[in-house]
C-alpha cells in the first residue's frame, strides 16, 4: 500500500455573477426556455444551475478569467446534467447552440476561439 497525495487547484466562482446570469436569463433554461423546473425554497424563483461553458478547471490555460457573465449559462437541472453526462452527439448540439449565442460576448471578455475549439475545450478534448 502506498499513500498518494493529490493537489488540486479550485478556482473561485462568483455567486453574484451566477445570480445575475440567472436574472439576465429571466430564470429560464438558455438551451430550451420551455423547460420547467421547481420553485427553489431559498430564492422563491425557478431552480436553475449555473454552467461554465468553458470549465473553470481550464482556467490556467487562459490569461483572462473564465468566471465572467459571458461564460456562465443558466440551465435547468436536466440540461445541466445532459451537457455533462449525455451522449456526445447531443452534447455537441448543446455546445454549438451556446457558442452561437455566446461567441461575440466571449470575445468581448477576451475569450476568442473558433466553434471547433470551443467544443473541444468545453468537452475537455484538447
Functional labels for PLM-detected ranges:
Residues 1-45, 57-67, 122:
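Short, charged surface segments at domain edges that flank catalytic/cofactor-binding sites
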Residues 42-126:
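A detector for short metal-coordination/catalytic motifs
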